[in-house]
């Protein structure tokens, strides 16, 4: 993550304009104490001491956007009863544009009532409609989006399967976004993702990705297969899978991907975390951030929100504070090859010498560290090309790697001698070397110059190859064998 770029983006939030389309709800919280059992039945009695009523569903996306200071408009259908009018009033109080709202006498505005005691949610009651909106309401919403799209920098779609987001409406919204060059970012729901076909970006969680793709996710490889299958099936530019304690994984149409570790320190309530992710990713794209940086910021925001109880939001000050306290320099070192190519071109123009090496680095040991330190001393910047999990399996067999590519990348990025880490999926780093064009290509002393992949390419544009002696007796294979021997000995 480029921290300066993010800071500049946060300073411009007030100028961004977002349209939120989706299922609006009221989130009601009843806070109390449980100190006795009911005489009527063997159940706890909750003595309510505090009540809270908030915008929920797509309304929590609005909460996030308003808290962040940007300009917000909404398009949806509500019931005409008390809750619908109350929700409208809450939107007006937040200065949200409501010209896209419709009201239906036959519809029940969604209200979710949660009972909390001793810091835990005990029960939830739902009152809502789930039937699709009618054709007239659908046409009115589509016309509103089409006529007003030029006023917005991003369209955020929050689907809770309550009937507002029909397939025809979604396809109309996505088509308008493409025509106008406006990103359409969707937080999806359900198992039929055909209605999201052609969207700019989807933000399903891990379970939703499993259901939509039909592929059980048990490791990084199955996650990749599920993501790629889903993207191809519904013609997606980008898929961003939120993975709770495992962070966020982003998959791009060009085959590249990036993985971000979780930023949560303590988790009290995951309610609304997906809304925070949708809000920050959407605003990031609207503000010109690369997807990976928008996702990294959203990851930080979600980490803040899950540390709060109830449907919560994050503000700019909290984001600044989190960026100051988290070790974001590690994340900023892990790059996609195309973005890293651009960075290295700038550094070379500044007179910097780029050193490149590559490997699996499964079970990092002292031999690795000394090798990397020596490589770094050969130039100004050390770039490490890291074999992906799939690449290692092809090279070393199905039992490897022991450490996932995401974890290996972050361990290596924590080393001060490494400036950038880039994961590659090919069997050799030749294509990556051709993209990055390093000045110095480094391999271990167990190679000869003639056996180094990329030697001819690097020398063809004036670069050179360097071989570094390895530490005797230090290898991942030796460590594994030693562990197994000692385990067998008891």
From Swiss-Prot:
Gene3D superfamilies: 3.40.1190.20, HUPs
Pathway listed: Nucleotide-sugar biosynthesis; ADP-L-glycero-beta-D-manno-heptose biosynthesis; ADP-L-glycero-beta-D-manno-heptose from D-glycero-beta-D-manno-heptose 7-phosphate: step 1/4; Nucleotide-sugar biosynthesis; ADP-L-glycero-beta-D-manno-heptose biosynthesis; ADP-L-glycero-beta-D-manno-heptose from D-glycero-beta-D-manno-heptose 7-phosphate: step 3/4
EC number annotated for this UniProt entry: 2.7.1.167, 2.7.7.70
Catalytic function, reaction form: D-glycero-beta-D-manno-heptose 7-phosphate + ATP = D-glycero-beta-D-manno-heptose 1,7-bisphosphate + ADP + H(+); D-glycero-beta-D-manno-heptose 1-phosphate + ATP + H(+) = ADP-D-glycero-beta-D-manno-heptose + diphosphate
Keyword Transport: no
Keyword Ribonucleoprotein on entry: no
Signal peptide (UniProt feature, chain positions): none
GO CC terms: cytosol
Active site (catalytic residues): 275
Pfam families per record: CTP_transf_like, PfkB
GO terms of biological process kind: ADP-L-glycero-beta-D-manno-heptose biosynthetic process
Residues annotated to bind ATP: 205-208
Cited function: Catalyzes the ADP transfer from ATP to D-glycero-beta-D-manno-heptose 1-phosphate, yielding ADP-D-glycero-beta-D-manno-heptose.
Family affiliation: In the N-terminal section; belongs to the carbohydrate kinase PfkB family.
Subunit structure: Homodimer.
Name by which UniProt lists this protein: Bifunctional protein HldE
Native organism: Syntrophotalea carbinolica (strain DSM 2380 / NBRC 103641 / GraBd1) (Pelobacter carbinolicus)
Encoding gene, per UniProt annotation: hldE
């Amino acid at each position: 993550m480029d921290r300066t770029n993010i800071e500049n983006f946060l300073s411009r939030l007030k100028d961004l304009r977002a349209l939120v389309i989706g299922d609006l709800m009221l989130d009601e919280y009843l806070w109390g104490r449980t100190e006795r059992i009911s005489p009527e039945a063997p159940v706890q009695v909750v003595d309510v001491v505090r009540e809270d009523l908030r915008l929920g569903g797509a309304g929590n996306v609005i909460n996030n956007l308003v808290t962040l200071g940007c300009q917000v408009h909404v398009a949806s259908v509500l019931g005409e009863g008390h809750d619908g009018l109350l929700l409208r009033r809450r939107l007006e109080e937040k200065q949200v544009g409501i010209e896209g709202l419709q009201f239906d006498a036959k519809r029940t505005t969604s209200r979710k009532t949660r009972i909390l005691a001793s810091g835990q949610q005990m029960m939830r009651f739902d009152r809502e409609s789930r039937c699709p909106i009618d054709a007239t309401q659908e046409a009115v919403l589509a016309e509103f989006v089409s006529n007003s799209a030029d006023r917005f920098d991003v369209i955020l779609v929050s689907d809770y399967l309550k009937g507002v987001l029909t397939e025809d409406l979604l396809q109309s919204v996505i088509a308008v976004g493409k025509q106008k060059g406006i990103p359409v970012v969707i937080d999806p729901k359900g198992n039929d993702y055909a209605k999201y076909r052609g969207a700019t970006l989807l933000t399903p969680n891990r379970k939703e990705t499993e259901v939509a793709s039909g592929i059980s996710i048990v490791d990084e490889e199955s996650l990749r297969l599920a993501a790629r299958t889903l993207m191809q099936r519904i013609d997606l530019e980008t898929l961003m899978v939120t993975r709770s304690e495992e962070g966020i994984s982003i998959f791009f149409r060009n085959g590249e991907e990036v993985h971000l570790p979780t930023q949560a320190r303590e988790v009290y309530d995951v309610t609304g975390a997906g809304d925070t992710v949708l809000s920050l990713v959407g605003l990031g794209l609207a503000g010109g951030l690369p997807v990976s940086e928008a996702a990294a910021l959203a990851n930080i925001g979600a980490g803040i929100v899950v540390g709060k109880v109830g449907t919560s939001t994050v503000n700019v000050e909290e984001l600044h504070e989190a960026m100051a306290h988290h070790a974001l320099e590690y994340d900023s070192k892990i790059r996609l090859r195309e973005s890293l190519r651009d960075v290295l071109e700038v550094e070379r123009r500044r007179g910097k010498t780029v050193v490149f090496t590559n490997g699996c680095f499964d079970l990092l040991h002292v031999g690795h560290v000394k090798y990397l330190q020596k490589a770094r001393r050969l130039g100004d910047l050390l770039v490490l090309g890291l074999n992906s999990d799939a690449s290692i399996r092809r090279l070393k067999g199905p039992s490897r790697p022991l450490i996932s590519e995401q974890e290996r990348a972050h361990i290596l990025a924590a080393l001060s001698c490494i400036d950038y880490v880039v994961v590659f999926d090919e069997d050799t780093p030749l294509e990556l070397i051709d993209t990055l064009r390093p000045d110095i290509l480094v391999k271990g002393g167990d190679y000869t110059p003639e056996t180094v992949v990329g030697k001819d390419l690097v020398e063809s544009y004036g670069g050179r190859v360097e071989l570094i002696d390895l530490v005797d007796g230090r290898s991942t294979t030796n460590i594994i064998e030693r562990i197994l021997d000692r385990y067998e000995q008891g």
